[in-house]
Amino acid sequence: MVFMSIKYLHQPQHFTIQGITYKIRVVNGFTNNSSLPLVIWCTSQDGDIGGRALQEGDDYTWYARLSFWAPTPAYSCTLKWDRARIMFAPFKVLKGRTPRSCGTCRKCLWLVKEDGVYFSNDDSKWVKEISWI
């Protein structure tokens, strides 16, 4: 573990004194949701981080910071649209690994559409991860 930490410290583009910062963004990608907003509510192990009612094209963005001396943040969100609900983890770190597949740009991007929830780390290649039930 010490060896891994020292090696990581020598990569300045990924480390600051405050830690490594990741962008988490959830976008309402509906094309025809009329007067029904997409409602999102998120929490972390530290408590409630809040929610929003998103109209078409609106987004909910926050940042997670990883550091060697603080607990690793994990977030869970509930999406509600009409009568459908989805719960998912937009940012989760498995012990000894990097967060999800957030990539070298450190972005966890989510696009919510009528048929489900899509993930990307570069805002161009989207992979469907969850379907509305």
Show which residues each predicted segment covers.
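Intrinsically disordered, low-complexity segments enriched in small/polar residues
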Residues: M1-P73, T78-I133
